[in-house]
């Protein structure tokens, strides 16, 4: 069956968006708020009608992820910020495979996410309460699967409990995107053998987004 590279690219951009937000948080203590909302909201939507619907139904919601994806696909340097983004992206893919193969882990994750939906009736998505709850899901369900993702950045920034919670919640969103990526036919071999196809698709999507003013 022919691969749907549009859906694969969107899901891959979702992983990369989480990677970029984690990087911003770790270095600066804050990140693109709109992109963060899109990524966190993707965790909550358990029954989306399409791949794009996971990310709010708009390609523009993945602008950060698509731009990051192009950087990761075309990274010539093994050092610096691009290397960090590549490491986070690949690490999320590895953890997703462990999640999918661990007995009962996906069910546990689903049950815990259902609990978030109840909390959303009383608290905002980006409230400290929800951030802490999503971070706890990451720590309880994802982290034990190993290997842990080593987040690098400013030590002073990373000491903040609020930043730690946001980073873990954002990594959980990355896992959500990685699960979606496999569901729509994504696989790590594509990063080696279909790099040009993915690059072209990402550029096409970005090309018809309205430019940021």
Curated annotation (Swiss-Prot):
Its main location: cytoplasm. It comes from the Bacteria. Residues 79-126 form a coiled coil. It is found in: Cytoplasm; Cell inner membrane. One of its GO terms (biological process) is response to heat. Disruption phenotype: Cells lacking this gene show an increased lysogenization frequency. InterPro entries: HflD, HflD-like_sf. Keywords: Cell inner membrane, Cell membrane, Coiled coil, Cytoplasm, Membrane. Gene3D superfamilies: HflD-like. One of its GO terms (cellular component) is plasma membrane. It is a peripheral membrane protein. Pfam families: DUF489 (PF04356). Negative regulator of phage lambda lysogenization. Contributes to the degradation of the phage regulatory protein CII. Acts probably by holding CII on the membrane surface, away from the target promoters, but close to the FtsH protease. Belongs to the HflD family. Interacts with CII protein from phage lambda. This is High frequency lysogenization protein HflD. It comes from Escherichia coli (strain K12).
């Amino acid at each position: 069956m022919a691969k749907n590279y549009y859906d694969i690219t969107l899901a891959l951009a979702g992983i990369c968006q989480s990677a970029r937000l984690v990087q911003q948080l770790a270095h600066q203590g804050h990140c693109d708020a709109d992109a963060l909302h899109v990524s966190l909201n993707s965790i909550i939507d358990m029954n989306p009608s399409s791949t794009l619907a996971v990310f709010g139904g708009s390609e523009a919601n993945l602008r950060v992820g698509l731009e990051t994806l192009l950087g990761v696909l075309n990274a010539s340097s093994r050092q610096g910020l691009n290397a960090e983004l590549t490491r986070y992206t690949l690490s999320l893919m590895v953890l997703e495979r462990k999640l999918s193969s661990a007995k009962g882990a996906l069910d546990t994750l689903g049950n815990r996410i259902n609990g978030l939906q109840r909390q959303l009736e009383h608290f905002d998505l980006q409230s400290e309460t929800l951030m802490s709850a999503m971070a706890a899901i990451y720590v309880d369900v994802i982290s034990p699967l190993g290997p842990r993702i080593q987040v690098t950045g400013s030590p002073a920034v990373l000491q903040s409990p609020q930043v730690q919670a946001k980073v873990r919640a954002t990594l959980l969103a990355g896992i959500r995107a990685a699960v979606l990526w496999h569901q729509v036919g994504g696989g790590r071999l594509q990063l080696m053998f279909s790099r040009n196809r993915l690059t072209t698709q990402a550029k096409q999507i970005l090309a018809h987004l309205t430019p940021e003013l």
